């Protein structure tokens, strides 16, 4: 498995943490300050996964509604699409910045759908 195999998970969880949807103990300052990459954050603070206890109620509701569609759309993000496999996507803040546009749009769609 490529070293960047969990990049897609790290990008999503980092977005949640950076938007106040992770519990405080899963939103370290080193992530907010971009001292670690989203993938490093996932490995160090989330044991390579997203668990409900790590998220706020809003974070859990959004993740339940949007994570599977996010996985389907992740490969369409230009920075991701240039690779043969989504598992080759680099774990960088440049990647995050492009992927965050997708997640933000999905969040806005979700908020509209729930009347928020």
What are these regions (language model features)?
Residues 19, 23, 49, 110-113:
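Short secondary-structure junctions and interdomain/linker hinges
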Residues 104-116:
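Glycine-rich, aromatic-bearing surface loops/beta-hairpins
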Residues 31-102:
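Amphipathic protein-protein interaction modules
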Residues 1-45:
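N-terminal low-complexity, intrinsically disordered segments
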Residues 10, 20, 39, 59, ...:
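Residue-identity detector for glycine
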């Amino acid at each position: 498995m490529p070293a960047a195999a969990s990049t897609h998970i790290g990008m999503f969880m980092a977005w949640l943490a950076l938007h106040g949807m992770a519990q405080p103990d899963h939103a370290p300052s080193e992530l907010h300050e971009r001292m670690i990459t989203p993938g490093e954050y996932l490995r160090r603070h989330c044991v390579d996964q997203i668990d409900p206890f790590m998220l706020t109620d809003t974070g859990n509701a959004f993740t339940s509604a949007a994570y599977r569609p996010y996985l389907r759309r992740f490969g369409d993000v230009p920075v991701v699409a240039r690779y043969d496999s989504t598992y080759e996507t680099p774990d960088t803040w440049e990647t995050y910045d492009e992927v965050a546009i997708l997640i933000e749009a999905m969040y806005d769609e979700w908020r509209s759908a729930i009347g928020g």
